[in-house]
């Protein structure tokens, strides 16, 4: 166990589902993670997603997932300072979760549409 794991405080309980939902359970976080898997890295790219996340919510979620070790922030422009985001190993390990949600959603919501990029994410798993 790493020091990071030993120092975790449980917000509601020590149930792994509860702990995961405390970080990922809002309606935006997994969509941001999805976009990172699809190659989006910059703030404006996240804002351009079809779900139309508000800027204040996006800023909050990016800070939150960075603080929890799912992404790292890197400067790509100095003046004005602009950042891009990259998944960490911990963030990358959410791929099977997203793939399972795609599969489940397609099974139970047949009218849903999958973006071409999401289709690619699912096909990468099959290859």
Which residues does each predicted region cover?
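Short amphipathic alpha-helical/adjacent loop interface patches that line ligand
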Residues: 40, 50, 62, 91, ...
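Short, Lys/Arg-enriched N-terminal segment that forms or immediately precedes the first helix
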Residues: 2-21
């Amino acid at each position: 166990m790493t020091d990071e794991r030993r120092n975790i405080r449980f917000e509601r309980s020590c149930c792994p589902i509860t702990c995961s939902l405390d970080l990922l359970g809002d309606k935006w976080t997994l969509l941001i993670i999805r976009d990172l898997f699809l190659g989006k890295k910059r703030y404006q790219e996240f804002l351009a997603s079809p779900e139309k996340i508000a800027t204040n919510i996006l800023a909050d979620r990016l800070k939150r997932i960075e603080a929890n070790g799912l992404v790292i922030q890197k400067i790509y422009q100095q003046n004005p300072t602009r950042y891009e985001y990259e998944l960490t190993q911990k963030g990358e390990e959410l791929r099977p979760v997203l793939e399972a949600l795609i599969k489940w959603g397609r099974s139970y919501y047949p009218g849903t549409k999958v973006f071409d990029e999401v289709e690619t994410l699912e096909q990468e798993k099959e290859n």
